[in-house]
Amino acid sequence: MSTPTPLSYKDAGVDIDAGNALVSNIKAAVKRTRRPEVMGNLGGFGALCEIPTKYKQPVLVSGTDGVGTKLRLAIDYKKHDTVGIDLVAMCVNDLIVQGAEPLFFLDYYATGKLDVETATSVVNGIGEGCFQSGCALIGGETAEMPGMYEGEDYDLAGFCVGVVEKADIIDGSKVAAGDALIALASSGPHSNGYSLVRKVLEVSQADPQQDLNGKPLIEHLLEPTKIYVKSLLKLIAASDVHAMAHITGGGFWENIPRVLPDNLKAVIQGDSWQWPAVFSWLMENGNIAEYEMYRTFNCGVGMLVALPADKVDAALALLAAEGEQAWLIGAIADREGNEEQVEIL
C-alpha cells in the first residue's frame, strides 16, 4: 500500500502566503487613513479606537453595505481600483445622513482564488475612500473560499462606525412645511440599479466602449460613488440641517420618505436639473418608464438636504466652495390623507 501524498492548505485552494503578501501590500494605504483615536497596529485580533474627546455625549452610529452587481461589471472590465471607493461611500454616506462623523471602517473581501494584485487594487481603493471621508481603515477579513466563488470572482462588504453628539443627531424630526430641499449631484449611478444596468446592456447589445459625452459608456457606469462626508459635515456645522436622504436603492420613492414625518411630503421640481447623460442613455436603451427610473436610480441626485428656506443661499454657497454641484430642487409641504410622500412635478 502506497503512502498518501501529504496535503497542505494550498493543495485545498487556500494560499496563506498570498494572503500575507496582500497584507504587506496594503499597509501604506491603511497607514494613510490613520486617525489619532486609533490604538495599536494592523493585524491584531481586534481593532481599537477611542471616541474623540470633543464629544460630550457621544452616540455611535453604525452601517454596513456592499457594492452589489456593479462588481460584475468591474470584474468583467478589469476595473478594480475604484470599487473600494464605492464600498466606503455606500457606508459613510449613510452615516452622514444622521450627522455622524465616520470614525473607522472594516472590509470583507471574499473570493474563490486570491489574486494578490487584484485584491491590492481593491483594498487601495478602500483606503482612498476612507481617506476621502476622514475615516480610519482599521481592519478587515480576506476569505479565500474555493468552491464558493468561481475562479477569481470576488465579493465585498463594508462596515463603518461613526459618532455624533447626542443633541445633534439628525433624524428628520425637525422637518417642517416650507423647508427647502437642496440636491447634491451624483457622479453617476453610484452603486445601485446595476442588475438593471446589466440587463439594459444585454438587451440593447450596446458596445460598452461606445462614446457617451466624450468618454466610453463603461467609464460612466463604473464612475465611483461620490463621498459627501466632508462637505456635509461643514454644512451641518454652519447651517440648520433638518434632514438628509442618501438616494440609493429604491431611488426617490423609497429613500426620501425614510426621513420625513408622516404628515409631510417632498415636492420636487423635475425640471430643476438635467439628468446626466448616462441616465438618459439607460432610459432610452432600456425603454424604462420614468417612474421606474426614479425608483431604481438616483437620476443625478446623490444626496438630498432639507433645511429652512432662509438658509438656502448660504448653504449653496458653502457647498459650491467645497466643490459640490448643488441646487434648489423643491420644498417640504403638508401631506393630506393618503397622498404620496414624494411628488415630482
UniProtKB/Swiss-Prot annotation:
Q: State its location(s).
A: Cytoplasm
Show the InterPro entries listed in the entry: PurM-like_C_dom, PurM-like_C_sf, PurM-like_N, PurM-like_N_sf, PurM_cligase
Disulphide bridges, residue numbers: none
Q: Which residues form the signal peptide?
A: none
Q: In which pathway does it act?
A: Purine metabolism; IMP biosynthesis via de novo pathway; 5-amino-1-(5-phospho-D-ribosyl)imidazole from N(2)-formyl-N(1)-(5-phospho-D-ribosyl)glycinamide: step 2/2
Principal location listed in the UniProt entry: cytoplasm
Database matches in Pfam families: AIRS, AIRS_C
Q: Which UniProt keywords apply?
A: ATP-binding, Cytoplasm, Ligase, Nucleotide-binding, Purine biosynthesis
GO-annotated cellular components:
cytosol
Tell me what reaction this enzyme catalyses. 2-formamido-N(1)-(5-O-phospho-beta-D-ribosyl)acetamidine + ATP = 5-amino-1-(5-phospho-beta-D-ribosyl)imidazole + ADP + phosphate + H(+)
What Gene Ontology terms describe what this protein does at the molecular function level?
A: ATP binding; phosphoribosylamine-glycine ligase activity; phosphoribosylformylglycinamidine cyclo-ligase activity
Q: What class of enzyme is it?
A: ligase
Q: What are its E.C. numbers?
A: 6.3.3.1
Q: Which GO terms describe its biological process?
A: 'de novo' IMP biosynthetic process; adenine biosynthetic process
| CDD domains (UniProt xref) | PurM
Its family? Belongs to the AIR synthase family.
Record's PANTHER family? TRIFUNCTIONAL PURINE BIOSYNTHETIC PROTEIN ADENOSINE-3 (PTHR10520:SF12), TRIFUNCTIONAL PURINE BIOSYNTHETIC PROTEIN ADENOSINE-3-RELATED (PTHR10520)
Its recorded name reads Phosphoribosylformylglycinamidine cyclo-ligase
Q: Which organism is it from?
A: Shewanella baltica (strain OS155 / ATCC BAA-1091)
